[in-house]
Amino acid sequence: MPANKIDALFVNFLGNSPKWYKLAILSFLVINPLIFFFINPFVAGWVLVLEFIFTLAMALKCYPLQPGGLLAIQAVAIGMTSPSQVLHEIQANLEVLLLLIFMVAGIYFMKQLLLFVFTKMITKVRSKTYLSLLFCVAAAFLSAFLDALTVIAVIIAVGIGFYSIYHKVASGKDFSSDHDHTSESHDQLNADDLESFRGFLRNLLMHAGVGTALGGVCTMVGEPQNLIIAAQAHWQFGEFFIRMSPVTIPVLLSGLLTCVVVEKLKWFTYGVQLPENVHKILSDYDAYEDTHRSDRDKVKLIIQALVGVWLVAGLALHLASVGLIGLSVIILTTAFNGITDEHSLGKAFEEALPFTALLAVFFAIVGVIIDQRLFAPVIQWALTFEGNAQLVVFFIANGVLSMVSDNVFVGTVYINEVKSALLSGQITRDQFDLLAVAINTGTNLPSVATPNGQAAFLFLLTSALAPLIRLSYGRMVIMALPYTLVLSIVGIVTIESGFLVEMTQYFYDNNIIMHHSAKELTESVVGH
């Protein structure tokens, strides 16, 4: 191939990404087969995981689907995993994919109601600390009953709405004008106000993101892995909440206290105030909307509110899978609000489909983790401990692995390994139940450290909002750090101090929960 053609190919490769980034991805593609075939497949597997994390960390340089996808395709091609294993992972996580496709699109059609509610909240509540706590508590409460991805989709829709309103007015347009809020070529924009507003939105989004983890860990419907763990242990909704409470309640209170402290002390880039000019624009927008709201608009808000009630009720009562409820939200809101042309419907799917494709690529990496047994040494090591020490080690081991891998996968692998240990007589049924608590809290809490562990964080990082407010991988890690430390330390202390064991015994003694037998677990292994 002529030199100019090669140059053109290199320029086209990964588009506008920096040259060093393109070279890094190409070098990964060269060294991976060499390590796999000539050094050690286990080492090659861990190298691939680290490379995939690198593509996520560089999400603002290049969307991770392309570089991560190339690594995943090569991994399948050289035999690190198989197409059937990738398909199995996608099948096992079909509900998550349906949730992304339909629920996020459904939330798009409810954004008028969301903007109405949250605009009132932001314009009326002037204390940033109280507002942050409000976002954190609201996200925690919702995530106890809804999936964290759904809650984050709501928060992202609200964030984009606020940003576009400010950007439109600051660019010299009125509220009713069409405007491209992703453009940065408007001279009228006040750089200081814009930067402060970005910081303000970053703060609220991170508080809400951590809130989803704080609430999601408490109930069996809060996170997908909670459902898997509850199914393996044969726990119902109430028993799950009670068994988790010795760890989750102290952690929840500590997390909310952390929210207040970082805001008050302005640590880790928190404490950014809403600029007065931006507050005025949002207040003016609120007044403008109230004045110009027609009967049709009011009916639209009522319809969206009624659909919102159905959404919460349907998810809390598990009337259908999350994705199907999302599809019903799309149908109900569009049918009764008169959105019937294909182009208008298509816009709703733009946000979630790239991330859905990225998640499918992520499942290929999970396939490598399974086929190369990358976590096996850690699990076997953890099982060598006994009693309370074993609970602490499982919490820490789950936490560390959940920072680099999907917490649904980590939780599923661990609960199945512990179930095998119970059935082979290595542990008692009571110890199994305590380990299930350690696994659930270990996968949910420390995983806020990076976007890798929490699908909701990864969705936020790769959303259309992240580049607008300059929310990068590194920034997310730094902003999550105080929460990571507090949630992890409090979680470890509640287990290591014996508080979990003592409270569980108290629940047994007072017949709040009952002892289970190993015979209940003779059914086939769920998940992987």
Curated annotation (Swiss-Prot):
InterPro entries recorded: Na+/H+_antiporter_NhaB (IPR004671)
Keywords assigned: Antiport, Cell inner membrane, Cell membrane, Ion transport, Membrane, Sodium, Sodium transport, Transmembrane, Transmembrane helix, Transport
Compartments where located: Cell inner membrane
GO terms, molecular function: sodium:proton antiporter activity
Annotated catalysed reactions: 2 Na(+)(in) + 3 H(+)(out) = 2 Na(+)(out) + 3 H(+)(in)
Family classification: Belongs to the NhaB Na(+)/H(+) (TC 2.A.34) antiporter family.
Name of the protein this chain belongs to: Na(+)/H(+) antiporter NhaB
Transmembrane segments: 11-31, 67-87, 98-118, 140-160, 240-260, 311-331, 350-370, 391-411, 449-469, 476-496
GO CC term (a single one): plasma membrane
Membrane topology: Multi-pass membrane protein
Role description: Na(+)/H(+) antiporter that extrudes sodium in exchange for external protons.
